[in-house]
Amino acid sequence: MSQDTLFDKVWDLHKVSRLPGGSDQILIGLHLIHEVTSPQAFGALKDKNLKVKFPDRTVATVDHIVPTDNQSRPFKDNLAEQMIETLEKNCLEHKIRFFNIGSGNQGIVHVVAPELGLTQPGMTIACGDSHTSTHGAFGSIAFGIGTSQVRDVLATQTIAMNKLKVRQIWCDNKLSKGVFAKDLVLHIINELGVKAGVGFAYEFAGPAIDELSMEERMTICNMSIEGGARCGYINPDEKTFSYIKDKLCAPKNEYWDKALTWWKSLKSDENSIYDDVIKLDASKVEPTVTWGITPGQSISINQQIPLLDDLSPNDKLVAKEAYEYMSFKPGQYIKDTPVDVCFIGSCTNGRISDLRVAARVLKNKKVSKNVKAFVVPGSEKVATEAKQEGLDEIFKDSGFQWREPGCSMCLAMNSDKLIGNQVSASSSNRNFKGRQGSPSGRTLLMSPAMVAAAAINGKVSDVREFIN
């Protein structure tokens, strides 16, 4: 009887050969590219007079460096304009499908691919971006890769990788009202640590995961990399299939029937052998906020920032650095920390469901006069849907700036940046030093609903006070 995990099954299906040294050559089913990590890869192909091996398995969009305040061409930022033009040229030359600004389907690559039905169970997916693990929410195995591997996939449709171990993270019970997928994944990373996943794929499972919507599952898998894992995935189920059905790039008619039959066979066996199993009680998770300079440094809304004596020797070193950088003191409560900027968006939390929950918190309320707040839809499709539902007006009426799709302040490669030592309440995925554009800017990660609550009060707040 088979004892394979979904990871084992997908890996073996895509294994081309065993390479000298013990790594495997893995076929990539879908290659996603964008304007930042692809130019050098295309340049390397040109230097060797090579073509893209399977252009029909490659899809491009622009997201990282695009402005969100004004997307009229040419951009004011000459570098951004040059990078977009380069991607346009490369896609045209190699006959690659490209979702450009104004196509109706442009946006953050990890938002666009699922909403178009490109992301499907059983796939191997690669992209020159660390949050490619997002696509594992559909039962695919998705890896972030570097520019040299982007080159390899363009040229051969394969990459060389060592097979990962698999850790199952079993989440019992279900999340309480006012607690979201972002809170759960921050809690998981805090419990396990930011390096615990090195060499692992994370399989998220259990009743709490089953309860989540597909967009919430994407949030969980998106931040696998923040826990050190190369990828994270969830076994596909009826929610998965319903989400994909009738999407623009989903299989149609008899091809859908064939795909569905295969997808239903793709799950970890009941007696799968895991390299490690972790069990957590999701019902005990509360709204969670990061206080430090790694996503693992988080606490519940009513908790105090840890004392040094309560930390391990390794954690003490990072904590001391975080106290100084963030201007926090050990034992200080995170609640009521003043914030200067509130950002809702990113590939972690820039989807329509994220905007809906934030809008519910903001409706008939006003952003604090001391706060600059802006919302950046994850894609043109998300923006269109939000406008049809009137969400954009709720945001604007409250005092949020409504922006155009892009990665924006998640990594601050455009003009959306913190200034000086501003404190940001952010729905993004990383709180490293300088991550949001200012060398001394400070980032507090939280759910979109928590960002909305912080925007109203001008300080870190418990969103349950707004929705219960």
UniProtKB/Swiss-Prot annotation:
Family: Belongs to the aconitase/IPM isomerase family. LeuC type 1 subfamily.
Reactions performed catalytically: (2R,3S)-3-isopropylmalate = (2S)-2-isopropylmalate
Pfam (any one): Aconitase
GO molecular function, one term: 4 iron, 4 sulfur cluster binding
Subunit structure as annotated in this protein's UniProt entry: Heterodimer of LeuC and LeuD.
Record NCBIfam families: leuC, PRK05478.1, PRK12466.1
The protein's enzyme class: lyase
Known role: Catalyzes the isomerization between 2-isopropylmalate and 3-isopropylmalate, via the formation of 2-isopropylmaleate.
EC number: 4.2.1.33
Cofactor: record remark: Binds 1 [4Fe-4S] cluster per subunit.
Parts forming coiled coils: none
Designated gene of the protein: leuC
Lineage: Bacteria, Bacillati, Cyanobacteriota, Cyanophyceae, Synechococcales
Pathway the protein acts in: Amino-acid biosynthesis; L-leucine biosynthesis; L-leucine from 3-methyl-2-oxobutanoate: step 2/4
Transmembrane regions listed in the UniProt entry: none
PANTHER family linked: 3-ISOPROPYLMALATE DEHYDRATASE, HOMOACONITASE, MITOCHONDRIAL-RELATED
Organism: Prochlorococcus marinus (strain AS9601)
Tagged with keyword 4Fe-4S: yes
GO biological process: L-leucine biosynthetic process
Protein name (Swiss-Prot/TrEMBL): 3-isopropylmalate dehydratase large subunit
Keywords: 4Fe-4S, Amino-acid biosynthesis, Branched-chain amino acid biosynthesis, Iron, Iron-sulfur, Leucine biosynthesis, Lyase, Metal-binding
Top-rank taxon, per record: Bacteria
Annotated CDD domains: IPMI
Cofactor(s) needed by this chain: [4Fe-4S] cluster
Keyword Cell membrane part of the UniProt annotation: no
Positions bound to [4Fe-4S] cluster: 347, 407, 410
